[in-house]
């Protein structure tokens, strides 16, 4: 190799280190895995999927806004730490904030970053100007980290950053107000990244945030990562291993093999509760929010069973209407035939007459036997408007509060 070839090769390597996170992680970063000892950071299946998803959003939108709902111990916080570390050391003037739900959690996340730094090759490691429990500043490039805890006193309000990692947001004490503060911390410009990640914590404010993301009603893209994506979540089986009926149904529905089912069975035994397992290790996003501590009218077991059951449509068509109260709220209509909801449609910004017109069109085209309208909390004139509109076509409409 000539000196010119060597210079070109070194230049290509440096550029790839800068532009390719997966290459950078494998070559420059060290992890301490569950078994101990440091080893190169090679993306696992969950990390690869998340990386591809985030990069696709960044290429399309110019910025990153994602909310991640995950099973436990998939290495997601480790990936996010690597991603933001890579951006921070290669972009002068960039600030990154790490926010955990409690002080110890924030400290643990910060230790991952410091381990990355301490074990890097000195030729690519930026010099440090400040290093303490709450800050890591790279002086010559004017980039660095701030570490804090989610509190009620305006999370991150006094800081300005371009990168933000918010961890275990389902366990934050006042998520709506804390999110309002955070959205002021990171400017709404290209090149910025806000990444929220968490395991579930029952029916709470995070569930509402997640549902909005799923419905496309927020700027955050939802990313769900089930436990089954991790090839390590398996257990060797004996020759006499047999699945029970529920396990066979799970295996068929989610394409799980016997070793995955065996791991699940052992983990349920460790947790001491089959109801707790889906919250810690969900297979679909919806079951993550089913908590054994939630005193619901319908038991979690029945909800999970219903979600897994395939029901063919049959019988008469009934329409359910949930009209918006006011403003830009959403009106939703469901088509039900027998025990199956065939579809749901939602529209925003409709007034009373527009909703009536929509329902009347459905009556004419789909010919339902009955329309049920939920008018709870709506003013009396709303109910009267429906009654007058549908009396003209002699159609039975039920309004229930």
Tell me the role of every PLM-derived stretch:
Residues 108-162:
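Inter-Walker segment of RecA-like/P-loop motor cores
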Residues 201-216, 237, 337-401:
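Mg2+-dependent endonuclease catalytic cores in nucleic-acid-processing enzymes, primarily RNase H-like
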Residues 162-174:
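SF2 helicase catalytic motif II
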Residues 60-84:
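Walker A/P-loop
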Residues 94-115:
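Conserved Walker A/P-loop ATP-binding site and its immediately adjacent core
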Residues 1-65, 123, 340, 350-353:
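N-terminal accessory segments
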Residues 171-256, 380-391:
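ASCE P-loop NTPase helicase motor core
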Residues 231-321:
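ATPase catalytic-site recognition across NTP-hydrolyzing enzymes
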